[in-house]
Amino acid sequence: MDEASHLPNGSLKNMEFTPVGFIKSKRNTTQTQVVSPTKVPNANNGDENEGPVKKRQRRSIDDTIDSTRLFSEASQFDDSFPEIKANIPPSPRSGNVDKSRKRNLIDDLKKDVPMSQPLKEQEVREHQMKKERFDRALESKLLGKRHITYANSDISNKELYINEIKSLKHEIKELRKEKNDTLNNYDTLEEETDDLKNRLQALEKELDAKNKIVNSRKVDDHSGCIEEREQMERKLAELERKLKTVKDQVLELENNSDVQSLKLRSKEDELKNLMNELNELKSNAEEKDTQLEFKKNELRKRTNELNELKIKSDEMDLQLKQKQNESKRLKDELNELETKFSENGSQSSAKENELKMLKNKIAELEEEISTKNSQLIAKEGKLASLMAHLTQLESKLNQRDSQLGSREEELKKTNDKLQKDIRIAREETVSKDERITDLQKKVKQLENDLFVIKKTHSESKTITDNELESKDKLIKILENDLKVAQEKYSKMEKELKEREFNYKISESKLEDEKTTLNEKISNLAAENSQLKNKIEDNSTATHHMKENYEKQLESLRKDIEEYKESAKDSEDKIEELKIRIAENSAKVSEKRSKDIKQKDEQISDLTQNLKLQEDEISSLKSIIDRYKKDFNQLKSEQSNIQHDLNLQILNLENKLIESEDELKSLRDSQKIEIENWKRKYNNLSLENDRLLTEKESASDKEREISILNRKLDEMDKEKWNLQESKEKYKRELQKVITANDRLRREKEELNENSNNIRIMEDKMTRIKKNYLSEITSLQEENRRLEERLILNERRKDNDSTMQLNDIISYYKLKYHSEVRHNNDLKVINDYLNKVLALGTRRLRLDTRKGEHSLNISLPDDDELDRDYYNSHVYTRYHDYEYPLRFNLNRRGPYFERRLSFKTVALLVLACVRMKRIAFYRRSDDNRLRILRDRIESSSGRISW
């Protein structure tokens, strides 16, 4: 039954009560070896590699199947005890072998063991624990100091790394802000260019509409002119507003470009600073790498020192345990001898000498224990102060560990943020590249649009100038016509009939020419379909030819529009004259004779105008011929252009049809237009003024276009600057990525170091907790024993004999069970030590063989103490040889042993013994529980 279940607070779960105090079942076992008394002595015990020994028969009957000693009732407490030590020669090996390992405990149990002295042994145990606690406290203090220095250095290094990472993080944030600003600037520039493009398109549309209105303006339709004038005035007002807005935007763009140039300069300076800082960080990182390597070497040295200290502490523990065991053994022997002396008065002088020797040894040991106890008592005060100091240091270490953990989390977060920032920066650089290409395309489109707008503006300017001149001439002619119209009435009728006839003839001719043109266009389309294959090879030439063709088309359009205007003017004049003649027939009858001459002159003028129109028609024909020639030259034009040509030709045909319809409608509307002519004259004068203002506005627009061209050049410069800055950002990003990888590696190394420190600190805390728990358990056990002593003394008079017998039997059983347990553990320990020795010997031999095969010799300063170096099987500078083997009796580590009857019999015997021992163990546990309950009930204390 485990005694720890009755201990308070459950702090001694691993302990078991014995007469000498509490011990742990694994840690505090002694290292003595149980030796069988029937074992055959080995003369070559030191040289186990010399070869296998022949089989020898055991001398005792106890190890055979015929043994019946285990089954006797008298051996209830002696089943698993070690036997008498016999025929064991002293070990010839010297060095690190423990002389007390193979101590025989059978002498301790030759006779009945008297009652032990638990209080005295408890005091010895307490002194021993105090000494161990003091030694371990010193070791923990040294370790704590070393760990504190190392932790401080690590914390300082980590703080430096954290500051560097924070600075890099701040710089990366600034770079991100700058990149976002540049992207926003790109977006604003893109929006502004789109707005400019839309405005230019709107201006182009308005100019086209204006040109159409000017071209399709009717001289005699005064209401249409008034409406057109009002529309033009509205459009001019809108254009002026738009021009103002465009100017404001242009000024804003200029200001933005200045601001961006300043920002770019500042960014360049910041980039230079960042480059310098990155170089400094690299140099610092290299220095820190060297420092880390140096610290790693120091850590290794310190770990080696710690291992050595642990080994020394274990050796000291073993020595103390051995001394305790020796003192116990001597006390037990003394007690046995005293009992024997009291029982048997006639004892030999040899035993008296042994008693004296044992008493002297006990006295010496007690003096040593007393001195050590005094030293321990003196050192306990120091230990208390050291423990307080240690607690303070541990609290500081915990605080710093928490700080390190928070900083490590911050480092992880910053590392993740840096990686995200790098990814975002890469994506932004890609998007920047795409946006830059889009901006380049848009700039090219804007340049083309500006070129087209300039052309259209110059053309519209020439058209407006021509219109103004023609309108001035028309006004003068109309004034003369108003005066002379009545006189020319009679002549105009004849001339009108002739002109109508000639007009019909010209219309028929125009229709014939139109049909011929359509046929030629169809032929040209067929030729164009044949020459599509050649278009791909001559794309550059076609582009220039396309521009020439567009110019020629524009010239054709102008000529056709001028021809229409002249035809309309002539028809308008004819209709006006007809209307005037019809209205003024009554008034003109008296003045007819006078006006005939004037009408003749007008007829001559009209004939001249008709001749001019015929010349214009012939010029149109020549233009069409030129168009044919140019079209033959432009055989490599694209299919889209052909489609546009067809549309334009259809538009021309529709315009011709519309012109015919307009001629008919003009004939009907001329009667109404004469009445409104004067009003129209005034309107025309106003329009003249308006057109003059339009000239001025056109010159302003030209200035604006020049300003826009300058802005486009500036935007191109900004684009190149931004591309350069983009490349710089890419280089910086690569540097930041490399720095981030380096910092990540350093952080991992720091995490490893911090984990090692935490492991060591956890070990220290565990050791400290174990010591404190042991101290508390010992104090409580001491208090409990003192209380039990007091209670026992009070009840001594009542039932002393019965209680003493119970206590004696209880402690006797307890002692015997502990001795058996210790002996079993010793056997296990010796077996494991043998296995370890064989394994290490095999490894050493194999390593020596490998070194010899590779011609590697040990250095001269190798002072390791290894027993097998001096063996005749293998020396330091001789060839490797395997030990001698017997062919008939193959035993040893290199051959499997042959099973024999004796091994099987011994196995069966061991099983029977194990069963018997388990049975007696259970019976002993039951007896112990009964005795403990009886003692506790008799002492007045019941433990549940």
Curated annotation (Swiss-Prot):
The UniProt entry, under Gene3D superfamilies, shows: 1.10.287.1490, 6.10.310.10
Q: Where Phosphothreonine occurs along the chain? A: 18, 64, 68
**Gene Ontology biological-process entries:** mRNA export from nucleus
For this UniProt record, the keywords arranged alphabetically read as follows: Coiled coil, Cytoplasm, Cytoskeleton, Nucleus, Phosphoprotein
What Pfam families does this protein map onto?
Spc110_C (PF18520)
Record-listed Phosphoserine modification sites:
60, 80, 529
Coiled coil as a keyword of this entry, yes or no, is yes
- Ranges annotated as biased composition (Polar residues): 28-46, 67-78
- Mention one GO molecular function: structural constituent of nuclear pore
The task this protein performs is described as: Component of the spindle pole body (SPB) required for the proper execution of spindle pole body (SPB) duplication. Potential role in cross-linking filaments or anchoring other molecules. It is essential for growth.
Protein name (database record): Spindle pole body component 110
Q: Which organism is it from?
A: Saccharomyces cerevisiae (strain YJM789) (Baker's yeast)
Gene (name only): SPC110
